[in-house]
């Protein structure tokens, strides 16, 4: 299997029990997770040699995050240690018409204040097949944006395939700031992943589609995919399409374009959703595995969508599924019967 590198922040999610609201809670569960950390764990579960690059404090709270990565087989040798803070976020799980809610407390975390000398990106990228990052990392600080650029440059020097999940977060930066940072980084990217909102707010493109209104046909994305491909020279443009009927009932499918053909995956109805956090990251992890191991872009996309559908049934940020489990769902086995 391949050496896959991800760069980003792992945080600690603090969540009330079950569907309790923040204001009624007297205790919180600690759940480690973060975009690129979640991707690293996904590809490690699929048998790849996964490396997570970040910076965490030396104290015990930082060690919680390091241990979470090690537990699921991710190599942590490129996690720098130092600084004072692990990023936190509070997540309240919604139900029915009440949406989930997130409050961030991540300012001045160790990775947000990390310096280039904390990492030897040429050593990190040596022998790697794939490097993945998301728009969350450059959003957390200007220093993290510079680290992202340096990592991308090193990846290109070493012939590494680069993927990005645009992943716009309005609580971290404005669209204007995102466009100014993200567009120059696209010259390093081979595989661009994002939904219709990400394409508009991170790159300035406006697709003719409305997921909230239920318009999730591939035709609404064809023009925008072609524009993105023409401007940035991506090998693949990929988008997930989510229909949100309630906090616990979503429709889920995806599209991929390789410059020649569009492919739309099968559609899943996920009901009930156990935990939506990490759903997009599980898609990215599945797509990376699929593009590395499958014969066609369609097969790769079906693996990614099935992997992500399964993630919605699992508590926590991490997609703790095997290749066989994903293949079974992608192949049509969604009956939920006991596997003996």
What does each model-identified segment do?
Residues 90-95, 322-340:
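C-terminal domain-closing interface element
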Residues 10, 136, 166, 282:
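Active-site metal-binding loops of divalent metal-dependent hydrolases
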Residues 172-259:
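Conserved phosphate/ATP/ADP-binding segment of small-molecule kinases
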Residues 92-145:
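Conserved phosphate-binding/catalytic loop of the ribokinase/pfkB sugar-kinase fold
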């Amino acid at each position: 299997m391949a050496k896959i590198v991800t760069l980003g922040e792992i945080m600690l999610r603090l969540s009330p029990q079950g569907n309790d609201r923040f204001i009624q809670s007297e205790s919180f569960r600690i759940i480690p997770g973060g975009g690129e950390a979640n991707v690293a764990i996904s590809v490690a579960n699929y048998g790849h040699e996964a490396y997570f690059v970040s910076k965490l404090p030396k104290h015990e709270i930082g060690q919680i995050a390091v241990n979470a990565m090690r537990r699921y087989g991710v190599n942590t040798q490129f996690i720098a240690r130092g600084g004072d803070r692990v990023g936190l976020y509070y997540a309240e799980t919604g139900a029915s018409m009440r949406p989930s809610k997130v409050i961030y407390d991540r300012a001045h975390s160790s990775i947000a204040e990390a310096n280039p000398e904390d990492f030897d990106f040429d050593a990190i990228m040596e022998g790697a097949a794939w490097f993945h990052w998301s728009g969350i990392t450059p959003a957390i600080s200007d220093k993290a944006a510079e680290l992202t650029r340096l990592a991308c440059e090193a990846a290109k020097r070493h012939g590494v395939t680069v993927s990005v999940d645009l992943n716009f977060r309005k609580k971290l930066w404005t669209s204007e700031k995102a466009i100014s940072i993200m567009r120059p980084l696209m010259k390093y990217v081979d595989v661009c992943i994002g939904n219709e909102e990400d394409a508009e707010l991170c790159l300035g493109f406006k697709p003719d589609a409305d997921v909230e209104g239920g318009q999730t046909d591939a035709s609404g994305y064809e023009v925008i995919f072609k524009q993105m491909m023409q401007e940035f020279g991506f090998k693949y443009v990929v988008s997930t399409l989510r229909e949100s009927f309630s906090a616990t009932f979503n429709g889920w499918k995806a599209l991929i374009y390789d410059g020649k053909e569009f492919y739309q995956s099968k559609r899943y109805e996920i009901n009930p959703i156990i935990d939506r956090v990490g759903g997009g990251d599980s898609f990215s992890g599945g797509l990376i595995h699929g593009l590395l191991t499958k014969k066609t872009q369609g097969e790769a996309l079906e693996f990614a969508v099935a992997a992500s559908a399964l993630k919605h049934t699992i508590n926590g940020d991490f997609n703790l599924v095997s290749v066989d489990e994903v293949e079974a769902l992608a192949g049509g086995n969604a009956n939920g019967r006991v596997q003996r």
